[in-house]
Amino acid sequence: MRKKFFCTFPQGLISEPIISHTLGERFAVIPNIRAASISDTMALVAVEIDGEPKAIEDSVAYLRERGVKVEEMTDNE
């Protein structure tokens, strides 16, 4: 299964490799960053996450627990 999300990272998490490293290792998903805009105060990231439904759900919950705002994208976005 593959789902698309739009993530807003707060300033304190910008330099951490949460998507590229942590999600893949901790939740056995394959994240694919499709677009990103990063400034000194926040990061906006469009990402596809491929994996089992429960693993995707757990990875999104983890991001939210860390303070990332996560919104699922529709097929039109």
Can you say where each PLM-predicted feature lies in the sequence?
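Long, contiguous binding/interaction regions
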Residues: 1-77
